[in-house]
A protein has these predicted regions:
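Secretory targeting signatures
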Residues: 1-34
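A residue-level marker of the well-folded mature domains of exported/periplasmic proteins
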Residues: 2-6, 31-343
């Protein structure tokens, strides 16, 4: 009797184990022909610009590897062309389309209205929809550190800063850079003149060259630039005129290891991978701004290559300030109006 009972219990346990294994298999292994998640990225520039476009491309590739999804991308898409590129991805079954260009906003919103079952994301967006979210990389903190560096390194007591257009996430870079220059200069007991400019474009190499050339004519010897093609031109001018250059948008040191002494990296790789992860786990929501900061731990960071040329005291002071930002004991104001800080 006991033997029969034991046998029955063993049989029941085996059946339960087999059932659980079968359930787990079908719950975790995609059925043949099941839908593959497709994510597209539309870039305004080159995937190898060491800036805004490349960092986003690397985020897409990181997400592809991490989540085993199907991805595609298109480079050099100007705003007038963005609508056709976006709609082509919609027709091809892409479920998340990231348009990495604020200036393509109108094309994004128009497509979102016609394809309500597809999610769209674009940077620095305030005009959102139920299927449109935006991501914001705030670099006021890293730009403040760049300002400290410029003030500490300049021998002429003249520095320059330029960017593309006056949108909040870019304006805050210029204003915080100026604040960092002024406060570090005051700490060092000197006065530093600041020259600033907006080029009106992200990609025009000549405009970046002209900005740095103009600053150099005023004897500025350290320049901070934020952009893609405009920074390629800015770095070329920095080489020509012997100016130290602080990159922006991505880590641009590899483009000119001699002249690029630091970069305010906007953290596009981590940011884009995070946005895709949110979409895949069901937490990405329309009508939401996803914001990333140095203190937030995902996205922006300050890439440093100046230890061999900067005074030890300056290096230490910048490191202390960065740590204070990270642990929350120092807050850098987020100025989004041009002229908030006098040059």
């Amino acid at each position: 009797m006991k033997r029969n009972l034991l046998y029955a219990i063993v049989v029941v346990l085996i059946v339960i184990a087999i059932g659980a294994a079968v359930y787990y298999y079908f719950a975790t292994v995609p059925a043949p022909g099941s839908e593959v998640i497709k994510v597209a990225l539309v870039l305004p520039g080159s995937k190898s610009d060491h800036g805004w476009s490349q960092s986003a491309f690397e985020g897409l590739m990181a997400a592809k590897k991490k989540y085993d999804i199907e991805v595609d991308y298109t480079e050099y898409v100007l705003p007038p062309e963005a609508g056709d590129v976006i709609r082509d991805y919609c027709e091809k079954g892409y479920k998340l389309i990231i348009v990495h260009d604020f200036l393509a906003k109108d094309a994004v919103l128009a497509a979102a209205a016609d394809y309500p079952d597809i999610y769209f994301c674009y940077p620095t967006g305030m005009d959102l929809r139920t299927n449109v979210a935006s991501y914001w990389s705030w670099n006021h903190e890293t730009s403040y550190l760049a300002g400290m560096l410029a003030a500490g390194l300049t021998n002429s007591s003249k520095v320059g800063v330029y960017a593309a257009v006056q949108i909040p996430t870019i304006v805050c870079c210029l204003e915080s850079f100026k604040l960092g220059v002024k406060e570090m200069a005051e700490e060092l007991g000197k006065t530093v003149e600041i020259y600033e400019a907006y080029t009106g474009t992200f990609e025009d190499v000549a405009k970046g060259y002209e900005a740095v050339e103009t600053f150099a004519s005023y004897r500025a010897d350290v320049v901070y630039g934020t952009g893609d093609g405009i920074n390629v031109g800015g770095m070329e001018a920095a080489r020509t005129y012997g100016v130290y250059f602080i990159g922006g948008c991505g880590d641009q040191h590899p483009l000119d290891p001699e002249k690029v002494i630091a970069s305010c990296d906007w953290g596009g790789e981590e940011m884009i991978c995070d946005i895709i992860g949110k979409f895949l786990n069901g937490t990405l929501q329309g009508n939401v701004k996803y914001e990333y900061t140095l203190g937030g731990g995902i996205g922006p960071h300050f890439a440093k290559y100046y230890e061999d040329i900067a005074p030890e005291e300056l290096v230490q002071r910048i490191n202390e300030t960065e740590q204070a930002i990270l642990n929350g004991t120092k807050t850098i104001p987020k100025y989004t109006e041009p002229g908030s800080v006098d040059p």
